[in-house]
Amino acid sequence: MTARPNPVTATVRSDIPMSDTVVSTTYSEQAAHLVARIDQDGLGSVRPSLYETARVISAAPWLPGEPRRLAYLLDEQAPDGSWGEGPERYRLLPTLSGVEAALAVLRRGATPTETARRLAGAVDRGLAALRALPRSGPWPDTAAAEILVPGLVAKIHEQIARIAEDGTPALDGWRPGPGPALPGGYDEALPAYVAKRYASVGSLPVKFHHTFEGIAGYLPPALIPDVPDLLGSSPAATAARAATASSAPSAGTVAALESVAERYAGSFPEAAPILVFERLWVAAALAHTHLPAAALPTVRRWAADIYDPRGVRGAPGLMKDADDTAMAVLVSSLVGLEHTLEPLDQFHNGSHYDCYIGEDTGSITANAHALQALGGYQRRNPETQHIYGPRTDKLRDWLIDQQRPEGPWPDKWHASPYYATARSVAALTRFGGGHAVTAVETAVTWALDTQRDDGSWGVWGGTAEETAYAVQILLSTSTHRPQHTRALHRAETYLGDSAGSGRHPALWHDKTLYAPDAMIEAEILAARQTLRTRHDLNRRVTTPIHAEK
């Protein structure tokens, strides 16, 4: 039974060690409020995606709410004509998507003349922005870019050719400029090749559902997935599937899209819902620092509901993956639930874990999370060390080998190395032993050396999210030199000054960049609390709360 928390401070305890530091009422209230807010959210806290919304505009003219989507499309175009967030190379795919959608609407001719004029201007500026982009890579490692980019370039050329032949109903005499060249590093034949490959097999793997729009036009009808809700949790994939059908979209498809559009004023995120990812990452961030007693029952329910002995999916319709599976095991342990490691076994390849079975590129952070799950499980169940001990040692060595010489780790899920480095350092500090000391210290030195003048950290510019990760890296070492103290003090000031200062920059990789706001808030909240309590780690709370087993 869970006791009533002290009105000033409270500590959550379970049979699994958690934070035992002094916790301010403000932190406890904020953390509990964040958990409660997430629990009431049926989709997850991400912003609309320009790329995704433009794909729905292009493929689903029958879906109510198009005027709002067009307003969003026009409003989101940058002064240089591009769309999207992040540096210019990240803007390639959203700009292709925006241009193609505007061309599709102009060809249909169902918009008011003023809207058509604005769309034509957006096309002209967008094509100019595409011509100004670099001609070759390296390009970001975002989801299925190797299929999505060539497919959209081909669609733009097709739209331009049809407008040249037929014109646009609302704009006499307007013609778009030349279509974009396919950037170096992409293969124009790949979408058709992938479709042909699986047509010969007779089935389409689930891994293509989330990015189905990239190959939808190349597949035979027999390979079109038939699912009742959003295909691969993606509005764009769902709209593309409906566009390939010979009949009108089903009521279920329309309802699934409308339910998401209602949340986003007609627009769409790249994945919905993201509840599994959001809840696991938020729970882990708070539990590693301090999980308020008021939030414990909710987080325990999340952990119990999400854990699956067959493996965990990050969202409905996606493949099972080692990252979410490891986090489900880890979060369960942090809140005193005992779940086995067996679901992770299917992803083990002999030296480390594949994030997906049959994946193209691996994930550092999935393996860092797996190391924490493995290490924690063995500490609680020492009789399993003969089974998992050798695997843990191999995983530790593999993770160390992935470190770059200057100190950071990269990862395919995040544009910033601070995320993967914080995750790797956390795993190696707890479960790497003496073998990991050099790797951790190298990462700490790198973090110290890359702090910005304002006390922040960031790959493109200082952000609160990346500063929270850097704080975790610096606090991982027991050797606190004066340089550490100064860096942490400056970080604490920066995080305090930036609180509530606006939306978080998009740094996470899906098809384009996105920002999982609740998860970011949890990391920042936890980092600020850890910085507050580092000054007096020996203080203890007067009324401990004992978590129910």
UniProtKB/Swiss-Prot annotation:
EC class of this enzyme? Answer: isomerase
List the ranges annotated as motif DXDDTA motif: 321-326
What Pfam families would the database entry show? Answer: SQHop_cyclase_C (PF13243)
* Alphabetic keyword roster: Isomerase, Magnesium, Metal-binding
Q: Which residues form the signal peptide?
A: none
Which reaction is this enzyme known to catalyze? (2E,6E,10E)-geranylgeranyl diphosphate = (+)-copalyl diphosphate
Motif (QXXDGSW motif) spans which residues?
451-457
A GO biological process held by the record = diterpenoid biosynthetic process
Recorded hits in InterPro entries, A to Z, give: SQ_cyclase_C, Terpene_synthase-like, Terpenoid_cyclase/PrenylTrfase
Q: Which cofactor does it need?
A: Mg(2+)
Q: What is its EC number?
A: 5.5.1.12
What GO annotations for molecular function exist for this entry? copalyl diphosphate synthase activity; magnesium ion binding; terpene synthase activity
The reply to whether Kinase figures as a keyword in the UniProt entry is: no
Q: What highest taxon heads this organism's lineage?
A: Bacteria
Cystine pairings recorded for this chain: none
What role does this protein play? Involved in the biosynthesis of the labdane-type bicyclic diterpene labda-8(17),12(E),14-triene. Catalyzes the conversion of geranylgeranyl diphosphate (GGDP) into (+)-copalyl diphosphate.
Q: Which PANTHER family match?
A: (E,E)-GERANYLLINALOOL SYNTHASE, ENT-COPALYL DIPHOSPHATE SYNTHASE, CHLOROPLASTIC
The Swiss-Prot or TrEMBL record describes its family as follows: Belongs to the terpene synthase family.
* Comment, domains: The Asp-Xaa-Asp-Asp-Thr-Ala (DXDDTA) and Gln-Xaa-Xaa-Asp-Gly-Ser-Trp (QXXDGSW) motifs are expected to bind to Mg(2+).
Q: Tell me the protein's name.
A: Copalyl diphosphate synthase
